[in-house]
Design a protein with these regions (language model features):
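A conserved regulatory-domain signal marking ACT and ACT-like small-molecule sensing domains
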Residues: 1-89
């Protein structure tokens, strides 16, 4: 992980995709809200029945690395049979 500075705070970015369904955005938002995290940037679109999103949040000490995030997030992603990728920057 890149060390944060006051000019360049550390952030994480999540790419998430699955078949479009009701409740995806709410579940993504709730996942972060329940952990006291603020989504600082969010983009989403649908194409041919598939949902795609990218979101960012400021890093804190909740997860030490991407693998720790993956372990906690996998259950949420499995609800939608989603694929996801996270990067700590």
């Amino acid at each position: 992980m890149v060390s944060p500075s006051s000019d360049n705070p550390a952030i994480a970015a999540l790419l998430f995709s699955c078949v479009d369904a009701v409740g995806i955005i709410a579940d993504l938002a709730n996942f972060f809200a329940e952990r006291g995290l603020n989504i600082s940037r969010y983009e989403e679109y649908t194409d041919d029945g598939h949902f795609f999103s990218r979101l960012e949040w400021p890093l804190n000490d909740r997860w030490e690395d991407e693998a720790a995030f993956d372990k906690e997030f996998t259950a949420m992603a499995q609800r939608y049979q989603a694929s996801f990728d996270v990067r700590f920057m």
